[in-house]
Curated annotation (Swiss-Prot):
This is Aspartyl/glutamyl-tRNA(Asn/Gln) amidotransferase subunit C. Keywords: ATP-binding, Ligase, Nucleotide-binding, Protein biosynthesis. GO terms for molecular function: asparaginyl-tRNA synthase (glutamine-hydrolyzing) activity; ATP binding; glutaminyl-tRNA synthase (glutamine-hydrolyzing) activity. It catalyses: L-glutamyl-tRNA(Gln) + L-glutamine + ATP + H2O = L-glutaminyl-tRNA(Gln) + L-glutamate + ADP + phosphate + H(+); L-aspartyl-tRNA(Asn) + L-glutamine + ATP + H2O = L-asparaginyl-tRNA(Asn) + L-glutamate + ADP + phosphate + 2 H(+). Heterotrimer of A, B and C subunits. The lineage of its organism: Bacteria, Bacillati, Actinomycetota, Actinomycetes, Bifidobacteriales. The gene is gatC. Belongs to the GatC family. It comes from Bifidobacterium adolescentis (strain ATCC 15703 / DSM 20083 / NCTC 11814 / E194a).
Length: 98
């Protein structure tokens, strides 16, 4: 069973640029040891007859039928716009004056 030492936890904190208190080091040491133990249990499972998979549930993408439709006219597209001019949307200037 792998166990993380306090020195390893401090080193991980240094790598992540995180200052850890003694209390946090102790808590993280326990948490990481539990995680490592759980990983070891999963690795012990007999998987010789199980094929590798990325997802245990088969995924199928639902795509709507690609049916051509009549597009909006320019007038219909700009009809709901707060401001339009000459068939184009008008938006407030977001960049400074040039």
């Amino acid at each position: 069973m792998p166990t993380f030492t306090k020195e390893e936890i401090v080193h991980l904190g240094d790598l992540a640029r995180i200052a850890l208190t003694d209390e946090e080091i102790t808590r993280l040491q326990g948490d990481l040891n539990v995680i490592a133990e759980s990983i070891n249990k999963v690795q012990e499972v007999a998987t010789d007859d199980v094929e590798p998979t990325a997802n245990p549930v088969p995924l199928e993408a639902y795509l709507r039928p690609d049916v051509p439709e009549t597009p909006l006219t320019q007038a219909e597209a700009t009809a709901g716009a707060p401001v339009s001019e000459a068939g184009m949307f008008v938006a407030p200037r977001i960049l400074g004056q040039e």
